[in-house]
Amino acid sequence: MKDMSMSNPTESAAVTDMKMQARGVDVFYGAGASARSADDMAADKSVTHAIKEVDVDIADKTVTAFIGPSGCGKSTFLRVLNRMNDTIDGCRMTGKVTLEGEDIYDPKVDPVQLRAKVGMVFQKPNPFPKSIFDNVAYGPRIHGLARNKADLSDIVEKSLRRAAIWEEVKDRLDAPGTGLSGGQQQRLCIARAVATSPEVLLMDEPCSALDPIATAQVEELIDELRTRFSVVIVTHSMQQAARVSQKTAFFHLGNLVEFDETDKIFTNPSDPRTESYITGRIG
């Protein structure tokens, strides 16, 4: 990993190494969440215990899906992976999260630089009020990834190609990103996220605001992106998780109930709570 201070999608992925690892992660919200032990905060009734002792391995060049009912903690845990919870008042995380063996919560780690390595795509497309070109160029500019204008143009083109939108926008790069359709805006946001060459790409329900055609385009793109990046996707759609991921984690009431190969989760789950969720009996 650089210094942070500065196939068929349903097939099982061969796990050669782990890109990220989380161990004993708890997340607490509330005025009482402070620099106390996890046990102390768990006993405090003024504190919401949102994530409870979660261990997860994120494999290299693999799509990992987080599924579970609304409020189960899957999006909260996703934000742990690039310290987005740092921006929320009264939120406290305990445990350890590493990116290629380095503790991302080490005080020496710059969260802004971390987020260049662990990119994020949000539920609702959120292009900046800038041109298509400047949306994609934003990250490389602030992180100093381009030596000159030609370098920057090359990064923008490659990122738009990786997001499968280059052919649709190559003749209007100066047009506002906000003028694109919803599906195009989401692919623009994906291009913006991959422009800093992240090692992990987090996606928080990236298709929930899209129509079926745009959803299919993004799902196809996710399978292509995993040839270069580790992808972690939160989704309410079990069908989508089954289509795009190789590993699936099922969350319920802040607990990681089961984490396994996607095929096994959906055909032969080990925990009865997982079976109840995927068959529609809970959720």
Curated annotation (Swiss-Prot):
EC number from the UniProt entry: 7.3.2.1
Catalyses: phosphate(out) + ATP + H2O = ADP + 2 phosphate(in) + H(+)
Task: Using the UniProt record, name the top-level EC class of this enzyme in a single word.
Answer: translocase
The answer to whether the entry has keyword Nucleotidyltransferase is no
Q: How is this protein positioned relative to the membrane?
A: Peripheral membrane protein
Positions of ATP binding: 68-75
Q: Which UniProt keywords apply?
A: ATP-binding, Cell inner membrane, Cell membrane, Membrane, Nucleotide-binding, Phosphate transport, Translocase, Transport
What coarse category fits the chief subcellular location reported for this protein? membrane
Membrane spanning residue stretches? none
Pfam families documented for this protein: ABC_tran
Family per similarity comment: Belongs to the ABC transporter superfamily. Phosphate importer (TC 3.A.1.7) family.
State what protein this is by name.
Phosphate import ATP-binding protein PstB
Which lineage do the record's taxonomy fields give for this organism?
Bacteria, Pseudomonadati, Pseudomonadota, Alphaproteobacteria, Rhodobacterales
